[in-house]
Amino acid sequence: MYPTVAMVHNVGEKRRKQQLNDRPYFLCEYAHAMGVGPGNAEAYWREIYRYDSMMGGCVWEMVDHAVLHKDGSYTYGGDHGEWEHDGNFCVDGLFYPDRRPSTGADIVRFLYRPIRVSHLSGDRFEVFNTTAFSMNRYELTFRWNDGSVEVLVPDTPPLSRTEVR
């Protein structure tokens, strides 16, 4: 659990070079949603998408652990007279106790976006369809801020990349 990005990269490289078995590599946990979100998760997903042997991973943890107090506030870690502890691991989920999404949920939703766009150079961009489905259900258009160019992105097959100019 919690391998570094460099470790994930090394596993991907070794599998690409057939120095490891060809089973999919799954990160059972690679990020913790404490604070404002899962931290360096984008770097992990760059590595996951770089190698065919990568399968994805899980973020800990889904929902805050807190108790709704009769005054409407949420309580946790030492608020009920129990033995004091560090209290760092109760209100740290992607969703608040009432299931509203936190900032961390927005970050994860962005990480799992179905289409990724990268600037290659000049007027060249790469569109990456991260899903197992065709992009034909989407209409994706590039528009430059000055309105000078508008490009309709062609259908991109599942798990494929298309260059757009």
Each language-model region and where it sits:
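Substrate-binding/catalytic cleft of secreted carbohydrate-active enzymes
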Residues: 1-103
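Generic beta-strand/beta-sheet core signal
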Residues: 28, 60, 120, 128-130, ...
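Proline-rich low-complexity regions
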Residues: 24, 113-114, 154
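Beta-strand-rich binding/interaction modules
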Residues: 124-165
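Sterically constrained small-residue positions within well-ordered secondary structures
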Residues: 18, 48, 118, 133, ...
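Surface beta-strand/loop "capping" patches
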Residues: 101-141
